């Protein structure tokens, strides 16, 4: 039987996710329509697509909708990134609660949450500072989302670094968010080199997600648009980290793959992508054999 996973929220430019309660109520009402109209055909739902990089791109960097950042015409990278991430988690919990109460028994589906998953490796293999920085990067990219979904709160390191700019879950909100995702969806393409950075006091006021994290990232791979480099070990490592750190939740790989140069002969043979998929599916198989509860792979 063929199953599909349907994403409710892909990218919304007009819905201001920095306005928490209003956006949460609208999003829940929108999800209600989706469940009612399509729930008999869709058994796997993801509420938010790539929640971490969506928020960073839209509210820290300003490179994706709605294009807000400190250096943009409007926005504040030091606060809005965390406010929006917080509101996305609360909106997800509201939608998950709606499904559990109104549709779960009748439709028998599942509601999950997705994030972009990098594998992080040290810029300098002998650098202890870079090794420590890797954990900070994981706390910010993974723990920011999976911490509340698994434990009901943000990682301690993130709370220390961001301070009062990081929203606080009430006891009720923490209980609602914790355990609200039936599965975790991940998007993965390539790893990143991590270098520890120390900001000079004179620059410390220009805070954003990356300066709070205290790392510089260099993405590995060929980004020409005609094929990504192959790092299957990175996929295996990501799945192992999620297994060990967040209680081995059910995982679906929702995005992976590589583009191809528009060449008819290459497209007919497609050898590169066959080899790519063999390598990555093999890495997923290794992770599953090592205990990862990975249940699906999409390209």
From Swiss-Prot:
Q: Which family does it belong to?
A: Belongs to the glycosyl hydrolase 1 family.
Record EC number: 3.2.1.21
State the disulfide connectivity.
69-72
- Glycosylated position list: 71, 76, 222, 290
Top-rank lineage group of the source organism: Eukaryota
| Signal in keyword set | yes
Show the PANTHER family listed in the entry.
BETA-GLUCOSIDASE 1-RELATED (PTHR10353:SF150), GLYCOSYL HYDROLASE (PTHR10353)
Active site positions, chain numbering:
50, 255
What organism does the UniProt record list as the source? Arabidopsis thaliana (Mouse-ear cress)
Enzyme kind, highest EC tier: hydrolase
Residues the entry annotates as binding a beta-D-glucoside: 49-50, 189, 255
**What are the recorded Gene Ontology BP terms?**
carbohydrate metabolic process
What is the name attached to this protein's record? Putative beta-glucosidase 2
**What Gene3D superfamilies is this protein classified in?**
Glycosidases
């Amino acid at each position: 039987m063929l199953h599909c996973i349907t994403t409710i929220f892909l990218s919304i430019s007009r819905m201001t996710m920095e306005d928490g309660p209003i956006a949460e109520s609208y999003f829940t009402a929108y999800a209600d329509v989706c469940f009612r109209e399509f729930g008999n055909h869709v058994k796997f739902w993801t509420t938010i697509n790539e929640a971490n990089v969506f928020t960073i791109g839209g509210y820290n960097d300003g490179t994706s909708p709605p294009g807000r950042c400190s250096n943009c015409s409007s926005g504040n990278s030091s606060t809005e990134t965390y406010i929006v991430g917080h509101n996305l988690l609360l909106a997800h919990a509201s939608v998950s609660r709606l499904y559990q109460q109104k549709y779960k028994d009748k439709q028998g589906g599942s509601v999950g949450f997705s994030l972009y998953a990098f594998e992080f490796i040290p810029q300098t293999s002998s650098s202890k500072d870079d090794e420590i920085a890797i954990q900070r990067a994981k706390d910010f990219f993974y723990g920011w989302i999976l911490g509340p979904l698994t434990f009901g709160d943000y990682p301690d390191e993130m709370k220390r670094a961001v301070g009062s700019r990081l929203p606080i879950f009430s006891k009720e909100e923490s209980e609602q968010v914790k355990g609200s995702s039936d599965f975790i969806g991940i998007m993965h393409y390539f790893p990143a080199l991590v270098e520890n950075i120390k900001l000079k006091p004179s620059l410390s006021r220009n805070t954003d997600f990356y300066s709070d994290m205290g790392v510089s990232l260099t993405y590995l791979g060929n980004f020409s648009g005609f094929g990504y480099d192959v790092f299957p070990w990175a996929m295996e490592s990501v799945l192992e980290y999620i297994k060990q750190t967040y209680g081995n939740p059910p995982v679906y790989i929702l995005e992976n793959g590589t583009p191809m140069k528009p060449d008819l002969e290459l497209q007919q043979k497609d050898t590169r992508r066959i080899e790519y998929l063999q390598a990555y599916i093999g890495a997923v198989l290794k992770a599953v054999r090592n205990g990862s509860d990975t249940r699906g792979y999409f390209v």
